[in-house]
A protein has these predicted regions:
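Extended, aromatic/histidine-rich regions of cofactor-dependent oxidoreductases associated
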Residues: 1-159
Length: 159
């Protein structure tokens, strides 16, 4: 597809508004609740900015050692930290893969040294250098679109 990606350049058109081609105007929209003149209304907006998002994708075990792995998506702003929380414990700093680039998915890992048998809740959060922290589900603005669910995503794993 790549409807708004340059392939062959025949002419340049400059505009002062966001390009809303066929797919952007139909598929990349979100509804969010806004207060307009004292009345709450659902307003359609185009998806524009990549918000901070991290998610745990798997927990592996090798030789009795457990490792939590995940990814980060962001808008290219440098990442200050990725942290992992297990059950009600403290946040622990994860290691970001050094091969990650500014706009790429950033992979992270966290050594879970004291894993015990049973069900556990694991969650990650990312913070950028400007102090922005990935929101929790409770802090996520009212939206009804699947495109912008960037809240922390707790997962239950069984050891």
């Amino acid at each position: 597809y790549g409807v708004s990606n340059v392939k062959w350049l025949n002419q340049i058109h400059i505009q002062d508004t966001r390009y809303m081609g066929r797919f952007m105007g139909r598929d990349y929209v979100t509804l969010k609740k806004e207060n307009i003149g004292g009345v709450e209304r659902w307003v359609e907006n185009s998806v524009t900015t990549m918000n901070l998002k991290s998610s745990i994708v798997r927990v592996t075990e090798m030789g009795g050692q457990h490792e939590i792995q995940g990814f980060v998506l962001n808008d290219g702003t440098s990442i200050e930290s990725v942290e992992v929380k297990i059950d009600d414990g403290p946040w622990g700093r994860a290691e970001i893969n050094p091969r990650s680039t500014k706009y790429s998915w950033k992979l992270f890992r966290y050594d879970w040294n004291d894993a015990t048998p049973g069900d556990h809740t694991v969650v990650s959060r990312v913070t950028d250098v400007n102090g922005n922290v990935q929101v929790t589900a409770e802090e996520l603005p009212d939206k009804v679109s699947r495109w912008e669910n960037y809240a922390q995503f707790p997962r239950t794993v069984r050891i």
